[in-house]
């Protein structure tokens, strides 16, 4: 019995260019190549909690805050407590790329523009033609914690969504993670669908 030849998935380069101290390769046939981007996949409806079991919700000022809330109140306040987590196909392998949105009166999507966490009134786009975005976070499991999740900003490497107490409120912020044991950047995500 003869062995089957496996088709090579190689790229043939026909030219090299140096532009601004960066070497670029020109492919002979680039129709199968995909540019760096995020492509929207299916959403999941989820409740997000910090490690104090406080529920993330959108307050009247459209700000993301955490509050003690029984499950029955989560259901009663579903438009403010149920988040739509859209998963995105990422052309690079860096974790599960997601956006976090909420449908209250209008669709709003979480942003970390200028390292400030807020909701922008917008639908998550179907495609983002870039390697980073203020609305894309990498959802990852926390090593050693089976049910804990972290959300790292795609725009600010090493910065994570975190819970921080300010005055009497527990706010969602963006924080540089200095320590792997920092529990403020850990969350549980309870899928609803």
Swiss-Prot record:
Pfam families from the UniProt entry: IL1
Matches recorded under InterPro entries: IL-18, IL-1_fam, IL1/FGF
Subcellular location: Cytoplasm, Cytosol; Secreted
Maturation and modification: The pro-IL-18 precursor is processed by CASP1, CASP4 or CASP5 to yield its mature, active form. The pro-IL-18 precursor features autoinhibitory interactions between the propeptide and the post-cleavage-site region, preventing recognition by the IL18R1 receptor. Processing by CASP1, CASP4 or CASP5 induces conformational changes to generate critical receptor-binding sites. The mature form is then secreted and released in the extracellular milieu by passing through the gasdermin-D (GSDMD) pore. In contrast, cleavage by CASP3 inactivates IL18.
SUPFAM superfamilies reported in the protein's UniProt record: Cytokine
One Gene Ontology cellular component annotation held by this UniProt entry: extracellular space
Pro-peptide region(s): 1-36
Domain of life: Eukaryota
Predominant localisation class: cytoplasm
Entry keywords, A to Z: Cytokine, Cytoplasm, Inflammatory response, Secreted
Site feature Cleavage, where: 36-37, 71-72
GO BP annotations listed: cellular response to lipopolysaccharide; cytokine-mediated signaling pathway; defense response to Gram-positive bacterium; establishment of skin barrier; immune response; inflammatory response; interleukin-18-mediated signaling pathway; positive regulation of inflammatory response
GO molecular function, one term: interleukin-18 receptor binding
Chain's role: Pro-inflammatory cytokine primarily involved in epithelial barrier repair, polarized T-helper 1 (Th1) cell and natural killer (NK) cell immune responses. Upon binding to IL18R1 and IL18RAP, forms a signaling ternary complex which activates NF-kappa-B, triggering synthesis of inflammatory mediators. Synergizes with IL12/interleukin-12 to induce IFNG synthesis from T-helper 1 (Th1) cells and natural killer (NK) cells.
Assembly notes: Forms a ternary complex with ligand-binding receptor subunit IL18R1 and signaling receptor subunit IL18RAP at the plasma membrane. Mature IL18 first binds to IL18R1 forming a low affinity binary complex, which then interacts with IL18RAP to form a high affinity ternary complex that signals inside the cell. Interacts with cargo receptor TMED10; the interaction mediates the translocation from the cytoplasm into the ERGIC (endoplasmic reticulum-Golgi intermediate compartment) and thereby secretion.
Family per similarity comment: Belongs to the IL-1 family.
Protein name, as recorded: Interleukin-18
Organism in which the protein naturally occurs: Bos taurus
Top-level taxonomy: Eukaryota, Metazoa, Chordata, Craniata, Vertebrata
